[in-house]
């Protein structure tokens, strides 16, 4: 069973955030392939983020997308930077810590995740994608995805999640909050590849 006394709630990866894919650890690259996300598709994405355990290790967004005012960044950067007020307005308002015990746990120990804002009237014709790999044995991953699609805008967002198989329990307790304003459209897709030792308790 799941014993929280044996789950590490924060594991720092042994690499820093990278903006060049060739600098990302090989096992993350290999897992992208196993998830069925080929090189050609990655090149056609509007932006890609990759989290390894508790922190993002890779993030990149196309200049043309950023030029339209689209914000795609990691949650830590968003809440510490110029988007802090927007994050505070929406963070854990759809899913509150009072919903259930795993929502409360997530609210207490969350780390990593993606923040996306698409301005009014902006239509992204190619998707943004975030990938979350829980690599540490006996650990939990608590990423938070917050997406706001403003009036008349549109977005396709893809998330992928996976972890190695271990003989001890791991926990994935991420949270996704999606705000779609009047006349806006959001297509949200998730690809998950878990083994039997993983407790996947997303909210």
Where are these regions (language model features)?
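N-terminal amphipathic, basic helical "cap/leader" segment at the start of enzyme domains
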Residues: 1-104
